[in-house]
Amino acid sequence: MNQQLNNLTLPIYMDYQATTPLDPRVMEAMLPYFTTKFGNPHSRSHSFGWEAERAVEEARSRVARLIGADTKEIIFTSGATESNNLAIKGVAKFYGNKKNHIITVVSEHKCVLDACRYLEQEGINITYLPVKPNGIIALETLKNAITDQTMLVSVMAVNNEIGVVQPLKEIGKICRARGVFFHSDIAQGFGKIPIDVNEFNIDLASISGHKIYGPKGIGGLYVRKKPRVRVTPLINGGGQERGMRSGTLPTPLIVGLGVAAEIAYSEMEKDTKHVNYLFDRFLNNIHSRISEVYLNGAKDPRYKGNLNLSFAGVEGESIILAIKDLAVSSGSACTSASLEPSYVLRSMGIGEELAHTSIRFGIGRFTTEQEIDYAVNLICSKIDKLRKLSPLWEMMQEGIDLKKIKWAVH
């Protein structure tokens, strides 16, 4: 239930990595395609179909422009999970009789890791690269992992849990030099940081509508045409989307994604400035008021709409309950129902005692300075109270090493 407090609507939304609110301009553009402009974009014999097809193609070109791609290289899907599966499994199925090795990273999104585990059962060899304590891969490790059997390297642009930005340009250069396809899950970076598929030598890129103030249920896969990348489709049917993704296209959702991409293209600089300012305000004010708060992942390069913080001596779950006026999560939305510490934080070498205390705060286009100040005040007062009640915090103050404590499974 929403409630009002000093012109603030509570709870305050700070979970922008899980999803973003629909931009009102996106909503406005979509509405006619639910009502009067309802044609099937594949109907070639009348104006309803032509009108829908025109709208779809305009959206496709807007999405392409945001990442420097050719319009024909964008395939519409239901979202980034499907795009990741299509890219990874599609390449493996098409090229699997020639090569049998894929490289990814231990801290990738769960859908990438699960697609790779599925392929392992099919006989494909997968290398999971480690990350440094700052969450970023070592390029030397990637170079050493590539063999003449490697067909694909999959590394995300911006991590969904900790916001660090991987060195895509350097990874792309390495892959191109070795004749290996480079796939990137850019869902958390699309429209938020500059990404150019040609400059970065990206061959496949997965995007999502609802991470950029667009609708849920729509995403895309960029598939390079030159040099050509082939993927075996996951879905068979009418052969839409260059034969890679059959099914009637959802025109209203595609229009929404296109407008969201257009807004991101023209307002990225403004959004970045806004988010960076609020990130600094939030982090500096927290650090000035409470001790033993750690930012997980590199501060730079990072998408600053993501603050993953560990509050030493307090359980993450109890923090979430205490700050229920803030909509936040511990870990990614896909796995936050689990009480296990985040596998992303563990992959960075963060111990259980700190991994258990982490909260992800998201800042976005519609976050206000007033909301940030309210959040800081609430967090500081609640952490203070929780620490007074916390035996862990007491033990830390007494100099007991929490790393030596045996944690019971929940």
Curated annotation (Swiss-Prot):
Active site residues according to the UniProt entry: C334 (cysteine persulfide intermediate)
Protein family per UniProt: Belongs to the class-V pyridoxal-phosphate-dependent aminotransferase family. NifS/IscS subfamily.
Listed EC numbers: 2.8.1.7
Gene this protein is translated from: iscS
Positions with a binding annotation for [2Fe-2S] cluster: C334
Protein name per Swiss-Prot or TrEMBL: Cysteine desulfurase IscS
Record function comment: Master enzyme that delivers sulfur to a number of partners involved in Fe-S cluster assembly, tRNA modification or cofactor biosynthesis. Catalyzes the removal of elemental sulfur atoms from cysteine to produce alanine. Functions as a sulfur delivery protein for Fe-S cluster synthesis onto IscU, an Fe-S scaffold assembly protein, as well as other S acceptor proteins.
Protein's organism: Rickettsia akari (strain Hartford)
Matching PANTHER family: CYSTEINE DESULFURASE, CYSTEINE DESULFURYLASE FAMILY MEMBER
Cofactor(s), names only, from the UniProt record: pyridoxal 5'-phosphate
SUPFAM superfamilies reported for this sequence: PLP-dependent transferases
